[in-house]
Swiss-Prot record:
Keyword Mitochondrion tagged: yes
Principal cellular location given in the protein's record: mitochondrion
Subunit structure of this chain's protein: Homodimer. Interacts with BEX3. Interacts with BIRC2/c-IAP1 (via BIR3 domain). Interacts with BIRC6/BRUCE. Interacts with BIRC7/livin. Interacts with XIAP/BIRC4 (via BIR3 domain). Interacts with the monomeric and dimeric form of BIRC5/survivin. Interacts with AREL1 (via HECT domain); in the cytoplasm following induction of apoptosis.
Transit peptide: 1-22
Name of the protein in question: Diablo IAP-binding mitochondrial protein
Length: 239
C-alpha cells in the first residue's frame, strides 16, 4: 500500500511537470501572439497617421529670387511702358497720316481749281470770274484748315516719338533684351511712314505753286494785252 501511494505520488508529480512543460511554451506563444496582434494595429496606425501628417504639412515651393529682384521688376515695368508708348505712337501716327492725306487732297483740289480758272481767263465776264474766285477762296480756306489740323497732330506725334525714344532708352538701361529693339524698330517704321506722306504733300504743294505761277503769268499776260488794246484804241481815237 505504501508502495502504491509512493508510485501514485511520483506519477502525479511527473504528470504535473509534463503539463507544466507543455503549458509554458503555449502560454509564451499566446502572449507573443497577443502582443504581436496588439502591436500590429498600432504600427499600422502610426504609419498611416504619419503619412497623413506628411500630406497635411504644406510643402513650401522653392522661391525664385531672380523673378522677385528689383532689376526684374524694373524690366517688367519698363516693358509695360514701352508697350504703352508704342500704342500711343501708333495711334498718333495713324491720325497724322490721315490728316496729312486730307491736307494733300485739299491742296490738289485747290490746284485743280487754279488750273481751271487759268484756262478760262479771258473767256469769263466779271460775274463768272467772281463766282469762280469764291469757289477758290473756299477751297483755300479748307486747305488752310487741314494744314493747321495736321500741324497740330504733328506736334502730338513728335511728343509720342520722344516718349517712345525715352522708353526705349530706359528699357536698354534696365537690361531688357527685346523691348528696346522692338521700340526702336517701331519708331523707325512710323518715321518712314510719315515721311512718305510728307513727300506726297510736298509734291502737291509744288503742283499748287506751279498752278499759281501759271495763273499769275496768264493773268499778267491778259492784263498786258488788254492794256495794249486800250492804248491802241486810244491812239486810234486821237488820230
Amino acid at each position: 500500500m505504501a508502495v502504491l501511494k509512493s508510485w501514485l505520488s511520483r506519477s502525479v508529480t511527473l504528470l504535473f511537470r509534463y503539463r507544466q512543460c507543455l503549458c509554458v511554451p503555449v502560454v509564451a506563444n499566446f502572449k507573443k501572439r497577443c502582443f504581436s496582434e496588439l502591436i500590429r494595429p498600432w504600427h499600422k496606425t502610426v504609419t498611416v497617421g504619419f503619412g497623413v501628417t506628411l500630406c497635411a504639412v504644406p510643402i513650401a515651393q522653392k522661391s525664385e529670387p531672380h523673378s522677385l529682384s528689383s532689376e526684374a521688376l524694373m524690366r517688367r515695368a519698363v516693358s509695360l511702358v514701352t508697350d504703352s508708348t508704342s500704342t500711343f505712337l501708333s495711334q498718333t501716327t495713324y491720325a497724322l497720316i490721315e490728316a496729312i492725306t486730307e491736307y494733300t487732297k485739299a491742296v490738289y483740289t485747290l490746284t485743280s481749281l487754279y488750273r481751271q480758272y487759268t484756262s478760262l481767263l479771258g473767256k469769263m465776264n466779271s460775274q463768272e470770274e467772281d463766282e469762280v474766285w469764291q469757289v477758290i477762296i473756299g477751297a483755300r480756306a479748307e486747305m488752310t484748315s487741314k494744314h493747321q489740323e495736321y500741324l497740330k497732330l504733328e506736334t502730338t506725334w513728335m511728343t509720342a516719338v520722344g516718349l517712345s525714344e525715352m522708353a526705349a532708352e530706359a528699357a536698354y538701361q534696365t537690361g531688357a533684351d527685346q523691348a528696346p529693339i522692338t521700340a526702336r524698330n517701331h519708331i523707325q517704321l512710323v518715321k518712314l511712314q510719315v515721311e512718305e506722306v510728307h513727300q506726297l504733300s510736298r509734291k502737291a504743294e509744288t503742283k499748287l505753286a506751279e498752278a499759281q505761277i501759271e495763273e499769275l503769268r496768264q493773268k499778267t499776260q491778259e492784263e498786258g494785252e488788254e492794256r495794249a488794246e486800250s492804248e491802241q484804241e486810244a491812239y486810234l481815237r486821237e488820230d
